[in-house]
Design a protein with these regions (language model features):
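Extracytoplasmic/peripheral linker and loop segments enriched in polar/acidic and small residues
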Residues: 33-35, 169, 295, 326, ...
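Ligand-site clamp/hinge motif
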Residues: 205-207, 237-286, 416
Length: 551
């Protein structure tokens, strides 16, 4: 299988999570509580550097793409437009109820609600979701979502090109039955990801991605011209309960730069834009002084994208060398690394699970506000193995500044770090595919991780389970006892026992094995124009476009 589009965290934009996946804050009451808000066209500005890659749900892997798809997507299950803890509670959307697994945990049966229709008027049947799953598995698509469907019975035969439909996916009328090779309590959460939006049963395979096609969500894409525009309008046959106040969205993809995106919104030429969080804190823009934070039009909310320094365990320096990996963790001054991008951009962390996830346990494994050099030097002594390391970072200004800070900090424990700028965004699928390439000569890599659905599996297992070696497990961490502990946790049903098991894994991995050095979790930053009714601004933590309304 080609893993060039492995699922990754994307940009300093912790989107994945936001789109129907979680609610981390709300500027005001949700538009969902209001019956009607006057229509109008909501204007969006995007730039190529932080724009969309595809509008095909099987292929999309950037935050803005998922943000737009959230307006058009109808899923079996989704999450409410509410702040946590309610925002983490899975609820049915097209499905009539959240499914209960069979006694052996390997079969899920979804019964669809009546009333959902595509924008061409055709009814949504179970075949729409079967097609979505099989498109993700199709080798011609190279979908980053394939890792969420690997354990469906027959998935391997589709991925290998031997058949076009997984035998474990059976659609009949309004009933969808999915059989798995092993128990997977997180399977309903996976079905809430954007990869499994309802699509027309005849939607063809296209490695370049389908653009404008019938959708079953509140809106649908009328026109898409890459690098130019996207036109989205109301689905006249929408049969769901999601808010949909505006008449549609006009998306201009031609902003000259990330700064231009923000400037367009600030002066009212656009109502919202998506760009790197750090751009908003450029002092020349003066947004904090003009709007304040979380008061009027400008919002900073805790996000779910982790920035980390990954260790390459396939190379001699860090392979079978947990002492040096822990030494690096103690030598880092995380607060200083955060300050390189602006103090409001993120919050430092030393663990792999976000603190807003249910069950999180703060273990204070490593210092956040300073380096602990005495302890770091003791751990590094005798473990430096030549004391030279190659650090990959994106070649743009802020990542390079962070890379040089890391170089200076690790010099304190005797490690000579060469910072290598890579002209690929450090949150892009291409960057993570490069890290996963066998023989790629990196020892340390600065990157970002954001889940496609809310479950600790999406942080712990996807990053560190040996089943995902060469894909999302780009560190190549492989520990038999820890793998067994991860898989036991994955088999637990949703609830406090599962949360506690993953909290223990999080602490064990960070404290004892350190396959990566967690640095911080990015905040999500939102600026809206003066045309936007702030009573309809719902932050999940990215702006919920379906809920917006205009004054």
């Amino acid at each position: 299988m080609n893993d060039r589009r492995i699922l990754v965290a994307l940009g300093s934009l912790a989107l994945a999570v936001a789109l129907g996946l979680t609610a981390s804050g709300r500027a005001a009451s949700s538009g969902q509580d209001r019956t009607s808000r006057g229509g109008g066209i909501f204007k969006i500005s995007l730039n190529a550097a932080s724009g969309i890659d595809y509008l095909d749900p099987a292929l999309a892997s950037t935050p803005p793409a998922w943000t737009l798809l959230d307006t058009t997507c109808a899923r079996l299950l989704s999450y409410p437009d509410k702040a946590p803890p309610d925002g983490f509670r899975l609820q049915p959307e097209v499905a009539a109820s959240v499914p209960v697994a069979s006694n052996d945990g390997r079969t899920y049966t979804f019964t669809l609600r009546r009333g959902f229709r595509f924008s061409d008027g055709k009814p949504v049947r179970a075949s729409a979701f079967a097609r979505a799953i099989n498109r993700v598995l199709a080798p011609a698509m190279h979908s980053p979502g394939v890792q969420f469907a690997r354990d469906i019975v027959g998935a391997g035969q589709v991925v290998s090109g031997k058949t076009t439909a997984a035998s474990g996916v059976v659609a009949h009328g309004n009933t969808l039955v999915v059989r798995l090779t092993r128990a997977a309590p997180d399977f309903p959460q996976r079905m809430a990801s954007m990869f499994f939006c309802a699509v027309p049963p005849t939607l063809p395979l296209d490695a370049e991605g389908a653009g404008a096609f019938p959708a079953a969500g509140p809106y649908y894409v009328v026109d898409y011209k890459p690098a130019e525009r996207v036109v989205i309008r109301r689905n006249p046959y929408y049969g769901g309960r999601r808010p949909h106040h505006v008449d549609g969205y006009d998306v201009d993809l031609r902003a000259a730069s990330p700064q231009d995106v923000v400037k367009r919104v600030d002066r009212g030429d656009a109502d919202w834009g998506y760009t790197l969080s750090g751009i908003y804190f450029d002092p020349t823009l003066g947004l904090v002084e003009r709007y304040g934070v979380n008061r009027s039009q400008f919002y900073v909310k805790s996000g779910l994208t982790m920035r980390m320094i990954a260790f390459n365990l396939s190379r001699p320096l860090f392979r079978d060398n947990p002492g040096l990996r822990k030494a690096v963790n103690f030598a880092l001054n995380r607060r200083a690394l955060v300050a390189a991008g602006g103090s409001l951009v993120s919050r430092p962390t030393d663990q792999y699970l976000p603190s807003i996830l249910p069950g999180f346990r703060n273990a204070d494994v490593y210092p956040l506000d300073h380096a602990e050099l005495k302890r770091a030097r003791v751990l590094a002594e005798g473990n430096l193995r030549g004391a030279k390391a190659i650090l990959y970072v994106n070649s743009s200004a802020i990542p390079m500044a962070i890379g040089n800070l890391v170089r200076q900090q690790l010099a304190e424990i005797g490690l000579d770090v060469v910072v290598t700028g890579i002209p690929i965004h450090s949150a892009s699928a291409a960057y993570f595919a490069k890290l996963a390439t066998p023989g790629e000569p990196w020892d340390l890599a600065f990157g970002l991780w954001s889940p496609s659905y809310i479950d600790p599996f999406a942080y712990i297992n996807l990053l560190f389970d040996r089943r995902f070696l060469g894909a999302s497990n780009f560190t190549r961490f492989a520990s038999a006892p820890v793998n067994e502990q991860m898989r036991r946790a994955a088999r637990l049903p949703q609830g406090s026992d599962r949360s506690s098991a993953y909290a223990a894994l999080d602490v064990r991995l960070a404290r004892d094995l350190a396959p990566a050095a967690a640095v911080d979790f990015l905040n999500e930053v939102t600026l809206v124009s003066g045309r936007v009714d702030l009573g309809c601004v719902a932050l999940r933590p990215v702006l919920d476009l379906t809920a917006v309304c205009l004054k």
